[in-house]
Amino acid sequence: MAVSFALFGTLVDADLPSDPAAAVAAELRERGVSVPPDFGAIYRETHVDAPEGAEVPLPAHVSAALAARGVEAPNNAARRAVVAAFDPTVWRRNGVEAALAAAREHGPVAVCTNCRVPELARRALVRADLRDAFDSVVTSAACGWRKPDERAFRTVARRLGVPPAELVHVGDDPATDGGIADAGGRFIDVRGTPLSSLGSELEVRP
């Protein structure tokens, strides 16, 4: 068995921007980019034609949104602006230590998170003092697939050296984290099983 955890809302909370488009626009201006007046609207539109289930990293989306209005973002400005816009304070949720200890008793442990922002997941783990707590960290931006697509979970299972059917995924959103079932694994919802009670739940074989 191996165990993976969702990150935001499961292991940690973070004060992420309430208006991501405005936050990114402000950072783009700081880097000399001429932000279109309707950036908030085009930020919410699709600009990159990706396969179903695939992730489009946020810097690529922002660059494409700007290009749709004929605006260039030189010197990697889109990526730098995105990274700066998502620079939150992070804190652990209750029960994390107990949950990780329980998971470790069963095998390797990973993070599997839908995260479009480069560096954000690892930065959050560092700030929550969880940098060395995992055998692998799989983000949608890096692996190319968003939960609930089963390919995201298959990536985690492969990194941890287990068949997907032996992967237990712990998360807070059945609509995304529950996709582990399509890969043959098991979903544990922290809304019904608190992290502090994960150990006893892992002992139950479905």
What are these regions (language model features)?
Residues 49, 85-87, 108-109, 140, ...:
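Short, contiguous strand/loop micro-motifs
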Residues 1-97:
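N-terminal helical cap/lid subdomain that shapes the substrate entry/recognition surface
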Residues 1-3, 101, 116-117, 122-206:
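Asp-based, Mg2+/Mn2+-dependent phosphohydrolase catalytic module
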Residues 6, 110, 138:
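Conserved beta-strand segments that form the floor/walls of ligand-binding pockets within enzyme
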Residues 75-91, 96-126:
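Substrate-recognition element of Asp-dependent hydrolases with the DxDx(T/V) motif
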Residues 29-34, 69-71, 106, 129-133, ...:
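Short helix-capping segments at alpha-helix termini
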Residues 51-52, 86, 111, 143, ...:
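Short, flexible active-site loop motifs that bind/organize anionic cofactors or intermediates
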Residues 10, 113, 139:
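Ser/Thr-centric signal marking residues that sit
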